[in-house]
Amino acid sequence: MSAALAAAVQPSAPASAQTADRLSHLKRLEAEAIHIFRETVAETENPVMLYSIGKDSSVLLHLALKAFAPGRLPFPLLHVDTTWKFREMIAFRDARAKELGLDLLVHTNPDGLARGVGPVSHGSEVHTDVMKTQALRQALDKHKFDAAFGGARRDEEASRAKERIISLRTAQHRWDPKRQRAEPWHLYNLKKKRGESLRVFPLSNWTELDIWLYIEQENIPIVPLYFAQERPVVEREGQLIMVDDERLPLEPGETPQQRLVRFRTLGCYPLTGAVESDAATLPEIIGETLAARTSERQGRVIDKDGAGAMERKKQEGYF
């Protein structure tokens, strides 16, 4: 048991009891997620798993492999590629797909690509709508998927906190918060009308701390960007933006500085801020998570696109 894990529990309880409680908590979350995977596959015709390459996707993939072991995954993975992911993320994606023999689908909005839509040229709102939301809807329609697994968690953000594990979407992939279904006693309603689809979130009840403890317990590979390292960054509007390639134009007088940083959350690189940190190991990251007083999504620029931005995006078909 790591020192960070020991610090997470009350010191008054015996160490053995503390470990048992924490592990049983993770085992309960694991069992719930595996049940959701199996139930969805049994009740839908053509499911897919959305794979965004981050820590939650890595845990989600690990759970899916456990749910259907020793067989192959009964569904493909879908990565919506905005062309603005960190280079280390794409390298990690390709390496994991090859290592595990995954059926990986990669989709980029061809219209957005032709128009050159990006976060620098068009801003975060247009980029997110065209290269993420519209691209996702295109891919789901193209392959006729009727259920999509995602790694969203309720503790991340307000609109995600009120979304059900099984989230009904219209034929246009829109989410209506008023049409949510009750889910008592882990009973899930996967029925839908023709043309409707489902978004399924097996990690809904996990916290950021749970994710890191499970990654440590299961030794799950993750993108190196989560670990502290000297990286070239510029500071803009309170965010440390990593200069990942030449596409990020520098402002007058701006010079990238090497700073010891890591990422708590990963997205398109100009829209994702790093945090100053010296946490270079999983126990150190867990310790930082325990001490954190801000959301991991504080570094997501898209969450600052006006009040209710995330809920509005979800209603339009976002993850």
Swiss-Prot record:
Q: What reaction does this enzyme carry out catalytically?
A: sulfate + ATP + H(+) = adenosine 5'-phosphosulfate + diphosphate
* SUPFAM superfamilies in UniProt: Adenine nucleotide alpha hydrolases-like (SSF52402)
Enzyme Commission no: 2.7.7.4
Cite a single Pfam family from the UniProt record. Answer: PAPS_reduct
* Main enzyme class: transferase
Q: Name one GO biological process term.
A: sulfate assimilation
Top-level taxon of origin: Bacteria
Signal peptide limits: none
Q: In which pathway does it act?
A: Sulfur metabolism; hydrogen sulfide biosynthesis; sulfite from sulfate: step 1/3
Cited CDD domains? Sulfate_adenylyltransferase_2
- Gene3D superfamilies, A to Z: HUPs
The alphabetical list of record keywords is: ATP-binding, Nucleotide-binding, Nucleotidyltransferase, Transferase
Report which residue ranges the record marks as coiled coil. Answer: none
Q: Which GO terms describe its molecular function?
A: ATP binding; sulfate adenylyltransferase (ATP) activity
Q: How does this polypeptide assemble, per the annotation?
A: Heterodimer composed of CysD, the smaller subunit, and CysN.
Q: Provide the function of this protein.
A: With CysN forms the ATP sulfurylase (ATPS) that catalyzes the adenylation of sulfate producing adenosine 5'-phosphosulfate (APS) and diphosphate, the first enzymatic step in sulfur assimilation pathway. APS synthesis involves the formation of a high-energy phosphoric-sulfuric acid anhydride bond driven by GTP hydrolysis by CysN coupled to ATP hydrolysis by CysD.
- Family designation: Belongs to the PAPS reductase family. CysD subfamily.
NCBIfam families, alphabetized: CysD (TIGR02039), PRK05253.1 (NF003587), PRK12563.1 (NF009214)
For this entry, the protein name equals Sulfate adenylyltransferase subunit 2
Per the record, the gene is cysD
